[in-house]
UniProtKB/Swiss-Prot annotation:
Protein name: Glutamate dehydrogenase
Gene3D superfamilies in UniProt: Leucine Dehydrogenase, chain A, domain 1, NAD(P)-binding Rossmann-like Domain
Coiled coil regions in record: none
Cited SMART domains: ELFV_dehydrog
Reaction catalysis annotation: L-glutamate + NAD(+) + H2O = 2-oxoglutarate + NH4(+) + NADH + H(+); L-glutamate + NADP(+) + H2O = 2-oxoglutarate + NH4(+) + NADPH + H(+)
EC top class named in words: oxidoreductase
UniProt gene name: gdhA
Organism: Pyrococcus endeavori
Keyword Amino-acid biosynthesis: no
Residues that hold NAD(+) according to the record: G220, Y221, G222, N223, A224, G225, Y226
Localization of this protein: Cytoplasm
GO CC aspect terms: cytoplasm
Family the UniProt entry places it in: Belongs to the Glu/Leu/Phe/Val dehydrogenases family.
Length: 420
């Protein structure tokens, strides 16, 4: 796990970005603090008749650009510092994608594996009752995150509707819902699909002809890792030569079939020992000689210890925070093109935005329309960041921050919250 305080890291990253832009001291001070922090107590009746008390959080980091947006995490080690940091990062992510949102995040300190489905439902509904006064389709829009899913979002939306006594617009109170109650097509694949568009554009700026026959290694084979393997091989003709999960990885220089590997993982609990592939460690996967490396699992896997051994030409950060600041510098010096996490994995929040738009208007799009709109958003954001990096001769992560913070700062100036 990460040893540094997450919110301290978020503030340091903001301060670093501020060096590359003109921003007033007062605005920077404002941006280092969340606009609203809510801590709630949620009593839940357990199946055995006893009552357990849970602590929940909702942080609305900055709403200069619009309603705050961000997931709800259920985790036994959830902390307010983590929720604040993630809310700050959501602020920058929505800004770099130019979505009309601010950033938010929610969390409950709970081990969901120890709860029955009925207990989960009571906790979900209790959380919404507790934060009801600070959320709405026009104020703060939650979504699924760690250990929460479309079913939990459905219970939460239903509770919000019951309290508000409103129907259709209330669909937009939460995104990541099941399709039957206002979910969007394309949401499952959104993170990977968005990442694929940024990889496509990255190869253009590197002057590659196309991606056919190029190699990719993917660390992590959850939702994003699987969909990325499938999309890059089937739509772009890339060779997925290695994938891994928490138990280890597999390598086949001739390429792996995404669906067959997923089936094997579901049957055996891991991708390891997949027929026709060689078992490798997660550490070995990162250092393979491939064209594209996509860390899609956990944070801080590329550090100053192994950054010098990275041989990929593109590092696509599908996970949150997979590269440490020290490693950023090393990759930059080596001439490796990084697609930073706020940009690379922003397909998820972008399709969440599309879901909200469809809910508010009551008009639903086809899968092709969702993909086409996502492509436009991701491509524009990629060049906003890439051109800023080139212009200022800074690496992509710093450019990502500069683009995002500048947009939030401009909104704060226009509202009269701060001065130049």
């Amino acid at each position: 796990m990460v040893e540094q305080d997450p919110f301290e890291i978020a503030v340091k990253q903001l301060e670093r970005a501020a060096q590359y832009m003109k921003i007033s001291e007062e605005a920077l001070e404002f941006l280092k603090r969340p606009q609203r922090i809510v801590e709630v107590t949620i009593p839940v009746e357990m199946d055995d008749g006893t009552v357990k008390v849970f602590t929940g959080f909702r942080v609305q980091y900055n709403w200069a650009r619009g309603p705050t947006k961000g997931g709800i995490r259920w985790h036994p080690e959830e902390t307010l510092s983590t929720v604040k940091a993630l809310a700050a990062w959501m602020t920058w992510k929505t800004a770099v994608m130019d979505l009309p949102y601010g950033g938010g995040k929610g969390g409950i300190i709970v081990d969901p594996k120890k709860l029955s489905d009925r207990e989960k439902e009571r906790l979900a509904r209790g959380y919404i009752r507790a934060i009801y006064d600070v959320i709405s389709p026009y104020e703060d829009i939650p979504a699924p995150d760690v250990y929460t899913n479309p079913q939990i979002m459905a219970w939460m939306m239903d509770e919000y509707e019951a309290i508000s006594r409103r129907k259709t617009p209330a669909f937009g109170i939460i995104t990541g819902k099941p399709l039957s109650i206002g979910g969007s097509l394309g949401r499952n694949e959104a993170t990977a699909r968005g990442a694929s568009y940024t990889i496509r554009e990255a190869r253009k700026v590197l002057g590659w002809g196309d991606l056919k026959g190029k190699t990719i290694a993917i660390q992590g084979y959850g939702n994003a890792g699987y969909y990325l393997a499938k999309i890059m091989s089937e739509d772009y003709g890339m060779k997925v030569v290695a994938v891994s999960d928490s138990k280890g990885g597999i390598y086949n220089p001739d390429g792996l079939n995404a669906d067959e590997v997923l089936k094997w993982k579901q049957e055996h609990g891991s991708v390891k020992d997949f027929p026709g592939a060689t078992n490798i460690t997660n550490e070995e996967l990162l250092e393979l000689e491939v064209d594209v490396l996509a860390p899609a699992a956990i944070e801080e896997v590329i550090t100053k210890k192994n950054a010098d051994n990275i041989k990929a030409k593109i590092v696509a950060e599908v996970a949150n925070g997979p590269v440490t600041p020290e490693a950023d510098e090393i990759l930059f010096e080596k001439g490796i093109l990084q697609i930073p996490d706020f940009l690379c994995n922003a397909g998820g929040v972008t399709v969440s935005y599309f879901e909200w738009v469809q809910n508010i208007t009551g008009y639903y799009w086809t899968l092709e329309e969702v993909r086409e709109k996502l492509d436009k958003k991701m491509t524009k954001a990629f060049y906003d960041v890439y051109n800023t990096a080139k212009e200022k001769n800074i690496h992509m992560r710093d450019a990502d921050y500069v683009v995002a913070v500048q947009r939030v700062y401009q909104a704060m100036l226009d509202r009269g919250w701060v001065k130049h």
